[in-house]
Amino acid sequence: IHSGDESKRAYNNATVRDDEMKNGMDRITGDYNDFWAGRDYLNDMEPMKAALLMSHGFNDWNVMPEHSYRIYEAAKAQGLPCQIYYHQSGHGGPPPMTLMNRWFTHYLHGVENGVENDSRAWIVRENDSKEKPTPYEDFPNPEASDITLHLNSGAPAKGGLTTEYAKNKGNEKFVDNKFFK
């Protein structure tokens, strides 16, 4: 919805967003329901036997990156070979051809090329080309550490995030507008 091929957006908005999603989601409570369970690939992981090369956009309005990460983690837990590639765009977008070529040459054609020893995570950093992702041992990066972020006020424009706690934040209000149109 509102990403991917622009020539398909009107149809996707009308069919998926304004019909399927509007009627299937639980707008009152926001609870996970049968509609969402039926769309959750994680529920169908058990019979999977294939190597997984997962690709996802950090700026996907439709499927949160957390969802691809959960599938990636489930594949690892099942002992499947897997790598994950994250880019800075929205919904859709394949990994670089060189990465796909190495992956599929090995896992589809059995060519010994060492791809199973490559980094498990490939991240396109801010302002970098999709063809030049930064390799990491895994995702999340094992060398990363947690930090606490605090909200700053900023209505009616936008607030911000800081590592310092602001003492005089004031009060702000958020209105969740459930109407799509």
Predicted regions and their residues:
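Accessory cap/linker subdomain of secreted extracellular hydrolases
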Residues: 1-47, 115
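Structured segments of extracytoplasmic/periplasmic soluble domains
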Residues: 35, 39, 51, 71-74, ...
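Short beta-strand/loop motif that positions the catalytic acidic residue
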Residues: 48, 54-56, 60
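Generic beta-strand/beta-sheet core signal
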Residues: 55-57, 85-87, 126, 152
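Conserved alpha/beta-hydrolase "acid-adjacent" motif
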Residues: 61-67
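Catalytic histidine neighborhood in serine/cysteine hydrolases
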Residues: 76-92
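C-terminal, loop-rich substrate-recognition/catalytic regions characterized by aromatic stacking residues
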Residues: 94-181
